[in-house]
A protein has these predicted regions:
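Surface-exposed molecular-recognition determinants
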Residues: 1-205
Length: 205
């Protein structure tokens, strides 16, 4: 289980709440596969990891790019992450979403924002970084302070699809009432976001 304080956002008197819980790998371990060292708790069987890291010491402004090499962060999944959600911990900032499912790369900077209803946006060469932005050991970062800045700390939640457990992908709507999206299993939790148009995130369970 987990313990709560008395914040009205999670534990207000007479209020009801829902929590979705994912088990990662237990005790976090050091990961040195990227240029930025991380602490990772990874469940490679279920395709989920939690990654803690500090911004690179030479990421001092949005245009920083490590002399064109950018930065990489080890995620511990052993497979390319389809979805990565990054949040700055020590200051205000939004939750930035990218990954293979959005065809995110350093060049296009494709991303969504978890706490916003906007469509997919781009931030070329400052959000994600490097030629192999998402691969089976690391994901790449630029110098934008929302994901990588000297003196700041971050957390990333990484997901890769696993048959029978999870599926992260995109699909095209057709406006009908009988549009079946194949996942290979019966989902218990569903998160949907229209990325070509504005609108909120839809969560079903």
């Amino acid at each position: 289980g987990f313990n709560l304080g008395n914040s009205v956002y999670v534990n207000g008197s007479s209020n009801n709440y829902v929590a979705w819980c994912f088990k990662a790998g237990g005790t976090k371990v050091a990961n040195t596969q990227g240029l930025i060292n991380t602490n990772v708790s990874a469940n490679t069987t279920l395709g989920f990891s939690i990654v803690e890291y500090n911004g690179a010491t030479n990421a001092t402004n949005d245009q920083s790019n490590n002399s064109g090499n950018y930065w990489s962060v080890g995620h511990g999944l052993g497979a390319t992450p389809d979805l990565v959600i990054v949040k700055k911990l020590n200051d205000v900032g939004s939750w930035y979403v990218g990954g293979a499912a959005l065809s995110s790369s350093g060049t296009n900077g494709n991303h969504l924002v978890l706490n916003a209803s906007s469509s997919m946006a781009t931030q070329s060469n400052i959000l994600w970084g490097g030629s192999q932005t998402f691969n089976n050991t690391t994901f790449g970062l630029g110098g934008w302070d929302v994901v990588n800045r000297n003196g700041d700390s971050y957390i990333a939640y990484c997901f890769t699809s696993k048959p029978g457990f999870s599926k992260v992908d995109s699909y095209a709507g057709n406006g009908t009432t009988s549009h079946l999206i194949q996942t290979g299993f019966e989902p218990a939790f569903l998160l949907i976001k229209g990325y070509t148009h504005g609108g909120g995130w839809v969560m079903l369970d």
